[in-house]
Every structure is written in C-alpha cells, then in structure tokens.
C-alpha cells in the first residue's frame, strides 16, 4: 500500500543518513544483505548497495568494495578465511569488463561479469 511505501522511503532516508554519519565518524561499515521491506534489495542484487555507499554515503569505490569484502569478513569473524585474496583463503572473485575501483556500477551489470570464481573453482565463465 501507498502508506507502507512512504514509510519505507522515510526509513530508507534516515538509514542512509545514519550510515553517512557513522562513516564520517570513522565507523567501519560492513555491507550485508537482507530483505527489509518494500525498498529492500533482492538477494543477489546487492551490488546496488555499493552504489549507495558511493553516491549517497560518500565512500570511494574502493572503500565501498572493502565494505563488501574485507570489512564484512572481519565483522563476521571470518577474516582468516575470506574477504581478501591471500594465500590459504577461499578464492572468491569476479573478473569484470571494466574497472570497479573507478565505477562500482559495473558490478551490477550482469553482462559485464566475465568470470565468477567460488572457493577457487570457476562457477561462471563468459570469456
């Protein structure tokens, strides 16, 4: 209903403002996924949250990417297993046609994703 959408939009704005204040205060922000009502991001489409961190919170593209990788792993206590590309860790990575360190929006363009590796195994190869 319309009232629910309005309330969700107001909540979303307040949520973004809160994240922005925390980021500006130096709080580590971890990107996660969950469904939070009408404005929630569908599972598997959370790359849009990287754009929100850049365009609405004020992070650089690499800070946003770190929020979804290294910082998220630290928040989960899994930094020894995932979150960065290091010897002995699970190799979860994407190869994209573009430079997400300059423009994170490339990560939500499914046609730009050339290769997906999960735990060191190729899961998708479009090269």
Residue ranges of predicted features:
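Short, surface-exposed loop/helix-turn segments at secondary-structure junctions
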Residues: 1-7, 107
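His/Asp/Glu-enriched, well-ordered alpha-helical/loop segment
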Residues: 2-3, 11-99
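C-terminal cap of metal-dependent C-N hydrolases
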Residues: 68-70, 87-127
